[in-house]
């Protein structure tokens, strides 16, 4: 096993809970899904489709991030790039940007990491 693989196995990474109050059910419970931290591979996929993803994050890129990372509690992907992408692109921008912001919150800046 490579050193990089050994080091990655040492880390315990928990999924982040994402709550979308605007998608609440009839009882008022927000739609909840899970998202693991954004990885280098995720950024590679997003940058291939959306140049300068981190510097110029478009709504389309946010939708692709949601499709890429959103999972059920059991780890199943929730959205697909076909029909779901078209539906998500029709959603209000504030909802999409709020979800993407919660997903980006899993990224810890160098400055914040140094504080810990």
Where are these regions (language model features)?
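Extended acidic low-complexity intrinsically disordered regions
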Residues: 1-14
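Generic cytosolic/nucleocytoplasmic N-terminal low-complexity/intrinsically disordered segments
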Residues: 4, 18-21, 48, 114-115
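Residue-level marker of intrinsically disordered, low-complexity segments enriched
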Residues: 11, 15-18, 36, 57
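Short acidic-hydrophobic surface loop/beta-edge motif
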Residues: 14-28
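Short, surface-exposed, charged amphipathic helix/loop patches that serve as local interaction elements
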Residues: 27-116
